[in-house]
């Protein structure tokens, strides 16, 4: 059996970049890392509470954090930033003040920028949220997978693999179902692959969704 490594960590430094860009002393490193995680959780919670979406997709692709001595720059890459801005016109400023209070940024300024992604459904996080929303609404898993693949085809990707594991459709015995369209070369380091694993809580139990998207080869 081939052991499956996380495709993002496998390609770090070649086709994949870091989401946190900062340096620190080894003794302060863990603090910085925890702070990053808290910032990400805080932003996700805020967006979850304040975004009124019909599809249940929050649309956060990734959150990049850059730190300098006097500034923390947070860049939120979103698929549908319009929804957040429409539901809360002053949402970004509110979020900024919330984060500043949370982290007591006395000597550091915190700055938040929201960037829109060109093709939201070419991003595995947004797709996973879409599938999770469908599964919560008791749509059959095959239908949800097919729909997700249709959406990625519009975002002209070269291949996609979707895997759902757990008590699918509320069956007694948990199983793993997967579907692949196009090429997904996991062993080619040159291949630019985006990956995400997402947990969804349904009334039957927890389902795990994994998505690999093959974007292009360098």
From Swiss-Prot:
GO terms for molecular function: rRNA binding; structural constituent of ribosome. Its main location: plastid. The keyword Ribosomal protein applies. One of its GO terms (biological process) is translation. GO terms for cellular component: chloroplast; ribonucleoprotein complex; ribosome. Residues 47-118 form the KH type-2 domain. It is found in: Plastid, Chloroplast. InterPro entries: KH_dom-like_a/b (IPR015946), KH_dom_type_2 (IPR004044), KH_sf_prok-type (IPR009019), Ribosomal_S3_C_sf (IPR036419), Ribosomal_uS3_bac-typ (IPR005704), Ribosomal_uS3_C (IPR001351), Ribosomal_uS3_CS (IPR018280). It holds the Pfam family Ribosomal_S3_C. Keywords: Chloroplast, Plastid, Ribonucleoprotein, Ribosomal protein, RNA-binding, rRNA-binding. Part of the 30S ribosomal subunit. Belongs to the universal ribosomal protein uS3 family. This is Small ribosomal subunit protein uS3c. It comes from Nicotiana tabacum (Common tobacco). The lineage of its organism: Eukaryota, Viridiplantae, Streptophyta, Embryophyta, Tracheophyta.
């Amino acid at each position: 059996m081939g052991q499956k490594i996380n495709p993002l960590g496998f390609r770090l430094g070649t086709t994949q970049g870091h989401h946190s860009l900062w340096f620190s002393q080894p003794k302060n490193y863990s603090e910085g890392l925890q702070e990053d995680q808290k910032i990400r959780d805080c932003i996700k919670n805020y967006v979850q509470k304040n975004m009124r979406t019909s599809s249940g997709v929050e649309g956060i692709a990734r959150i990049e954090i850059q730190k300098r001595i006097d500034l923390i720059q947070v860049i939120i890459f979103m698929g549908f930033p319009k929804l957040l801005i429409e539901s809360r016109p002053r949402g970004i400023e509110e979020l900024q003040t919330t984060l500043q209070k949370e982290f007591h940024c006395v000597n550091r300024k915190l700055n938040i920028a929201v960037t829109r992604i060109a093709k939201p459904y070419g991003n595995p996080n947004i797709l996973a949220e879409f599938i999770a929303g469908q599964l919560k609404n008791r749509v059959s898993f095959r239908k949800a997978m097919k729909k997700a693949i249709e959406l990625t085809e519009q975002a002209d990707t070269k291949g996609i693999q979707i895997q759902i594991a757990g008590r699918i459709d509320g069956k007694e015995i948990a199983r793993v179902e997967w579907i692949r369209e196009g090429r997904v070369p996991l062993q080619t380091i040159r291949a630019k692959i985006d990956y995400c694993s997402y947990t969804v809580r349904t009334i039957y139990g927890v389902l795990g969704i994994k998505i690999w998207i093959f974007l292009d080869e360098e």
